Amino acid sequence: MEKKTVAALSFLFIVLFVAQEIAVTEAKTCENLSDSFKGPCIPDGNCNKHCKEKEHLLSGRCRDDFRCWCTRNC
């Protein structure tokens, strides 16, 4: 009987642990116009590098308006 109880508790613990790991969700992100990027934005990675290194944000991308937009957590 004791082995069955230990096995059942172990199984329950594993199920709860897996359920907790699945419940983790991704943070929402927002885009803002870069505060300090100068010049036209062309898709060569400068905007992304600028947003990460100078503004300490998640990423950056050039949009159709040739301006640099940085991505941050909302």
Curated annotation (Swiss-Prot):
Domain of life: Eukaryota
Keyword RNA-binding: no
Signal peptide: 1-27
Primary location recorded for the protein, binned into one broad class: secreted
Pfam families on file: Gamma-thionin
UniProt record similarity statement: Belongs to the DEFL family.
Protein name: Defensin Lc-def
